[in-house]
Amino acid sequence: MGAIERNGYIFEPEYSVISQDGAIHVYKEGKFVEEIKFEFQGKFPEHNQIEELVNHYCAQFHQ
């Protein structure tokens, strides 16, 4: 799963299958902004879950 670019931000997801959690690191202009934590089930998070988190971030905090 690669980085997602949206609204001037870069979202880089990473996750741990063992602990069943992950985080999306948010960057703007190359600088770290914040971390969005999430949980998932299965072997990896579904792409739709990541997209929903990114969409929510963009809609709620940085229009």
Model-derived segments and their meaning:
Residues M1-K31, E35-E39:
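N-terminal acidic leader/helix
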Residues K31-Q63:
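Mixed-charge, Lys/Arg-enriched low-complexity segments
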